[in-house]
């Protein structure tokens, strides 16, 4: 380790993909936020604030471990890397390179994930995946088809301009604390309505102006009922639909056969709440 004196530097929080600015003070051992380009309010969530604690935590692994019977024993880095090389070489020789698979992580940097996939290619396989596929691949595909881009179509600051939020099947109060505490909650306190669709009650529910406790697995009937109410009560933005949305006619024709009360009750929600 270097004996050079360390000074706090502005960096990016490594916990998730929001990209909040973070700086670390070695004297206090605390992490604080700064007004970065993404989170301009300079706030960090408890998870990001605890990022530095992981580095020095007593349970953090700093030495390679290999299995010995029912337990793990420490070995040198040279031994561990040698075992990996020997095992990979044996697998490639016996079953071919496509018997290998590499699983990347969203908690790694872009550079780390890039190096991992280059190692996979060097060994002759394209079997590279990422943990984000389990939770985001369907989102990216659906948003790409419906909105033209598999990512958010607005900035965080745009959230403050909304008159109402519809949060379905998510708990941003705990899952996305920066967005919730810095953007959603202040707006709700200023009069923006928050409609929370979730079978459970949680911190997001407690901040919501309306809670629709949909039965698990019945989101589609609920959303069909909501859509029919919007159409029946003339709440659509016709100018927006005309210039920005395709397939409006087919969409409205589908709802000719949708009965609001039946779908709402199927979803376990009082039709009057819609």
Regions found by a protein language model. Give the residues of each.
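Molybdopterin (Moco) oxidoreductase catalytic core of the xanthine/aldehyde oxidoreductase family
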Residues: 237-248
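N-terminal export/assembly segments and adjacent metallocofactor-ligating motifs
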Residues: 1-233, 247, 251, 257, ...
